[in-house]
């Protein structure tokens, strides 16, 4: 969840918005927690069709006020601007679980604002982060599924298929927990947040492979799981007209 920013005032400047205080900027983005980012309208127009439309329709106001406490808080606005403007996000103080949750929220923000170029940069970053174990594989899988990116899901599977849960099941997205000793991609052992946040088409495609997933899997078995997931997902998407967010007719 977003960090506690109840002390924010119109004058608050901290590590999240300090980079975005250009005195020549003509737009102020006000995050849902009140933190303000001074940016140029041409930058918003260039990177988001939704912001472009908002700026065309707005009156003389120089503020865009964001209200969604989950995906429009200051930490997500900061990440979005970093990706859009070519800055390296500051991840030093972010733990693996919190960064995974933040990635899910950022992915939803990019979808809401149709930010195509930032989304592509984000996808490249996720490939790197999952490989370097900066973000855990199951978190990347969920984010990739929500962005309908099969190849990134497969990269997450390849990296983490042998990883096991160490805690008990939980529905809390902030508690990285599943049934101990089971693969993080065995959905019968997955925490409820993982099931809830993964689109149904991706859930079913992975579920069909769970009978193969277990301790001491050989590379041949792992490759079979990944190939099976790829085939099942393609078949399921044919049945939904390519829209993975739709329900599945069985």
Placement of each model-derived feature along the sequence:
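Short, surface-exposed loop/turn segments at secondary-structure junctions
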Residues: 90-97, 135
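Short secondary-structure capping/junction motifs at helix and strand boundaries
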Residues: 91-92, 118-120
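Ankyrin-repeat interhelical turn detector
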Residues: 111-114, 148
């Amino acid at each position: 969840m977003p960090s506690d920013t109840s002390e924010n005032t119109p004058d608050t400047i901290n590590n999240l918005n300090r980079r975005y205080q250009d005195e020549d900027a003509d737009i102020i983005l006000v995050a849902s927690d009140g933190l303000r980012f001074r940016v140029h309208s041409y930058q918003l127009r260039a990177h988001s069709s939704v912001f472009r439309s908002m700026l065309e329709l707005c009156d003389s106001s120089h503020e865009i006020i964001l209200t969604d406490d989950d995906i429009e808080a200051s930490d997500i606005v900061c990440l979005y601007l970093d990706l859009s403007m070519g800055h390296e996000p500051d991840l030093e103080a972010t733990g693996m679980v919190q960064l995974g949750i933040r990635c899910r929220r950022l992915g939803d923000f990019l979808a809401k604002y149709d930010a195509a170029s930032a989304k592509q940069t984000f996808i490249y970053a996720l490939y790197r982060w999952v490989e370097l174990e900066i973000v855990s594989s199951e978190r990347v899988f969920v984010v990739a599924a929500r962005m309908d990116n099969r190849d990134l899901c497969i990269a997450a599977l390849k990296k983490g298929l042998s990883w096991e849960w160490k805690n008990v099941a939980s529905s809390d997205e902030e508690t990285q927990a599943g049934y101990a000793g089971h693969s993080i991609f065995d959905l019968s052992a997955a925490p409820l947040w993982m099931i809830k946040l993964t689109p149904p088409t991706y859930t079913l495609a992975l579920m069909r492979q769970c009978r193969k997933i277990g301790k001491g899997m050989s590379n041949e078995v792992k490759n079979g799981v990944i190939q099976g997931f790829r085939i099942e997902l393609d078949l399921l998407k044919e049945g939904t007209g390519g829209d993975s967010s739709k329900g599945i007719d069985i």
